[in-house]
Amino acid sequence: MLKKNIYLITPNTLNKSFYYFLPKLLKTKRIKYLQIRLKNLSKKKLVQEIKKIKKIVNKKTKIIINDFPEIASLLNCDGCHVGQKDKEISLVKKKFKTLKIVGVTCHNSKKIALSSVKKGASYVAFGSFYKTNTKKT
């Protein structure tokens, strides 16, 4: 049987509830990837939050940083996730060789997905499939 894992993405703001539930979710051993997606923070505050999260996350869960490969590399995270308007995948892979994973957003475009894979993306993300307020920030 195919083992099912979860790719968890943080909410845009982290509160006590997030830090309460994160260890409980990690104990299920089903969270294979945790994408830290905090678009409204300064880089300094983002670094602080990543360090705090890294103390909680086990080695089996890969930490992916949204939009900032330089921070992901600096903090020895497993990878980064970039959007279409962010840095070019091939440049990220060339400049930040320590990042094992470089993912990219493809929205709903098969063409972008195929192009991203050719450029070296570790994975492609599609969505959102339903109307959401998440992508507004």
What are these language model-derived features?
Residues 1-123:
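Conserved N-terminal beta1-alpha1 strand-loop-helix module at the mouth
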